[in-house]
Amino acid sequence: KKGQKLNLKTYINEILKVAKGTPVSLEVTETTAAGMIKQGKALYKMFNKVAKNVYIKIPINPAFKNSDSTHFDGIIAIKALSKAKIPTNCTLIFTPEQALLAAKAGASFVSPFAGRVDDFIRVNNKIKVDKTAYYPSIGMTKSKKVLEDNGIYSGTDLVWRCVQILRNYNFKTQ
């Protein structure tokens, strides 16, 4: 049985209605500050009227390469959108310091990404990855001299440190 065809705008509207007051993040695809700001404002204007629950998802660092000049454009975009009273969800947070920068810029939410670094290392070293790599039935194990981290410990530590920073400085960011 085939599902009905919907256009993207209709589909997003339905998600927003079903979610009611729950925040829904809509992601920008631009990678420059100016592009993310323009796209973020357009998404917010187009969709927030549906259920007043739209947050614009902005990456902390939209650069694809070290040589790109857009490393801080996410922070610039968050600051501009926050000034325009548009709530944001800052994504691709890999360090507590990035969470601090996002909060200082006015992000409504920060979203730490704990597993991406592990995934990158595993893929580059041709290590087989499946869901048991992150959620083994026995959790963390202690080998002869080293406590092996299956990704959960480092991930929870990142989240804990981000929360501590936000609380210690009384940011409204969640």
Give the label of every model feature segment.
Residues 1-74, 78-80:
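Active-site beta->alpha loop and helix N-cap motifs at the rims of alpha/beta catalytic domains
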